[in-house]
């Protein structure tokens, strides 16, 4: 069914909550393991209609944040979502109370029962009102960001549409683009500062109600991190600071030499090549045709997937006024249909987001069609889900010539370099958030000062050269995740460590790398992050010294593939 033929009906929350109570009672009373397994499948399907409606509403709202009807529907789910989540948690609580619960681990793997325990530990009826308030705060942020229109080059442009100007070979044009963006954020400075303060206060209040010191502790439970915690993440960040950042300084020196910009400032960083960055082929149809060919040649599984996605028009990837920034993949369970949202801006990032979100969508497509995988175990934790997307960016490399033509080698270098350099920024975002939630009384200026300290630690090569907004340490406010889904960002770093290993493996044997990837994908959400890495034969990055060799291999490859 094509996306525009999918019907939306606001769900009956009362009926759903009553059904949840019934399922919880049945879970508590299930007489044996077989009955409990059957009931787990049943409860997993019970939310399909609700989730489909919620995701349809969110797709329509993010595609046009100015549409009053879809704004009202989004508000409905913001208001009712916490109650539905808590009802789901009560079902988990009932499963956990059943003496046969260990059968679920035997049937579905470690993440099933561990995930239910995290769900119970991460939710509380007393926080429902606070959760509703948090959702409303996020919607306010999305409206500020999604409603951004700036004047440049005689045009009204969205933030994503500034992308090509930021990559212009004329430094004055790049500076003007960043200043236009900065002007918009500075104009909303007071509101953005106030919003973030309210978000920190709200989430810390939720944590304290539930007996946690602050939200940085609760986040590990709510993010469903299984098998590791704050100490492992700290060790990971330390390895990045000590073993990756020194290599990145060499990489940035190579970039400066390559571009001929001897002393690059922040607005020079998007320039990767003296004669301009690689540009993908123009035109929606041409790109979609190339993507279809690419996925048909990659594997039979991806051929079936891309046909389904394109034939059912499950993409909205072109930027326009009123559309929310960013990119995502979501799922419409009733239709077993993934959906991909993006904001193309005619830079190489268009291919990044296409292959990235197709990685998420491919995993969802495969899991939704596996009868052994319950609906709520179709997707693993976010640090693992991002492996599907980030590794897909690299594993499609043999077909990138279809999208870049003569710029293919430039894109290969740019993409590998960007992914490697990203590790530092991702760790910076994570450490910043730990500081913010552990020190909630910091003033807006003090928050910005902390960000600038972390810039020196993780990205010492950056010179803001007096740039508004960024120069005062407020650039973090442009990072949607910090407002919308705190503590998510480190997941990108953990998955990048897996993706870089897939990249290095593919250089030696692409077929073997793809088969390892497919094994990982097919485990869906029924294995933890470390178990998934072991499935694919990859190193776990929490272990001391585990990153150093990968960092050296990446630097060596980048040194020998300068264009």
What do these predicted ranges mean?
Residues 1-278:
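A well-structured
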Residues 242-243, 367-368, 379-407, 415-416, ...:
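Post-HExxH zinc-binding segment in Zn-dependent metallohydrolases
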Residues 115-117, 227, 318, 354, ...:
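C-terminal, non-catalytic "cap/extension" segments appended to globular domains
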Residues 122-123, 179-188, 228-234, 269-280, ...:
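Glycine- and acidic
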Residues 342-368, 389-390, 394, 432, ...:
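Active-site recognition of the HExxH zinc-binding catalytic motif
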Residues 274-334, 347-348:
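Auxiliary, metal-adjacent structural segments of Zn-dependent hydrolase domains
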Residues 230-231, 254, 258, 298-301, ...:
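Inter-helical turn/loop segments and adjacent helix faces that build the functional surface
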Residues 196-213, 251-255, 359-369, 390-407:
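Long, well-ordered alpha-helical segments
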């Amino acid at each position: 069914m094509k996306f525009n033929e999918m019907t939306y009906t606001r769900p009956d929350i009362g009926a759903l909550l009553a059904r949840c109570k019934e399922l919880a009672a049945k879970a508590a009373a299930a007489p044996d393991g077989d009955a409990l397994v059957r009931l787990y499948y049943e409860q997993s399907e019970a939310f399909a209609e609700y989730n489909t409606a919620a995701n349809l509403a969110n797709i329509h709202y993010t595609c046009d944040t100015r549409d009053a009807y879809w704004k009202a529907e989004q508000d409905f789910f913001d208001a009712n979502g916490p109650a539905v989540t808590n009802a789901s948690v009560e079902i988990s609580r009932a499963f956990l109370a059943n003496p046969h619960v260990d059968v679920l681990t035997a049937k579905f793997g470690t993440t099933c029962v561990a995930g239910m325990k995290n769900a119970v530990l991460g939710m509380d009826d007393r926080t429902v009102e606070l959760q509703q308030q948090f959702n409303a705060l996020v919607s306010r942020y999305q409206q500020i960001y999604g409603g951004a229109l700036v004047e440049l080059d005689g045009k009204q442009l969205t933030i994503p549409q500034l992308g090509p100007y930021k990559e212009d070979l004329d430094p004055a044009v790049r500076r003007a683009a960043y200043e236009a963006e900065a002007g918009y954020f500075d104009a909303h400075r007071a509101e953005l500062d106030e919003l973030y303060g309210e978000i920190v206060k709200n989430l810390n209040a939720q944590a304290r109600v539930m007996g946690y010191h602050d939200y940085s502790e609760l986040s590990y439970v709510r993010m469903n991190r299984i098998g590791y915690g704050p100490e492992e993440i700290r060790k990971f960040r330390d390895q990045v600071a000590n073993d990756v950042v020194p290599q990145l300084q060499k990489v940035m020196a190579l970039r400066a030499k390559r571009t001929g910009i001897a002393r690059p400032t922040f607005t020079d960083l998007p320039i990767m090549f003296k004669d301009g960055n690689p540009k993908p082929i123009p035109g929606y149809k041409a790109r979609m045709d190339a993507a279809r060919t690419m996925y048909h040649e990659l594997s039979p599984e991806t051929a079936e997937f891309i046909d389904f996605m394109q034939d059912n028009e499950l993409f909205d990837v072109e930027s326009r006024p009123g559309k929310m920034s960013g990119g995502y993949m979501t799922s419409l369970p009733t239709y077993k249909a993934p959906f991909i949202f993006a904001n193309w801006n005619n830079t190489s990032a268009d291919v990044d987001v296409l292959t990235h979100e197709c990685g998420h969508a491919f995993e969802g497509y495969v899991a939704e069609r596996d009868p052994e995988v319950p609906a709520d175990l179709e997707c693993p934790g976010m640090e693992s889900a991002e492996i599907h997307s980030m590794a897909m960016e690299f594993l499609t490399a043999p077909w990138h010539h279809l999208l870049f033509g003569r710029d293919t080698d430039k894109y290969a270098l740019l993409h590998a370099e960007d992914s490697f350099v990203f590790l530092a920024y991702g760790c910076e975002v994570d450490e910043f958030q730990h500081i913010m939630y552990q020190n909630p009384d910091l003033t807006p200026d003090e928050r910005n000062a902390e960000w600038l300290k972390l810039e020196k630690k993780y990205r010492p090569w950056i010179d803001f050269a007096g740039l508004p907004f960024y120069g005062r340490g407020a650039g973090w406010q442009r990072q949607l995740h910090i407002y919308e889904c705190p503590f998510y960002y480190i997941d990108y770093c953990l998955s990048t460590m897996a993706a870089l290993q897939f990249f290095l493996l593919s250089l030696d044997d692409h077929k073997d790398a793809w088969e390892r990837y497919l094994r990982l994908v097919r485990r869906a959400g029924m294995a933890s992050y470390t178990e998934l890495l072991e499935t694919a034969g990859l190193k776990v990055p929490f272990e001391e010294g585990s990153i150093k060799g990968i960092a050296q291999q990446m630097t060596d490859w980048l040194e020998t593939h300068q264009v």
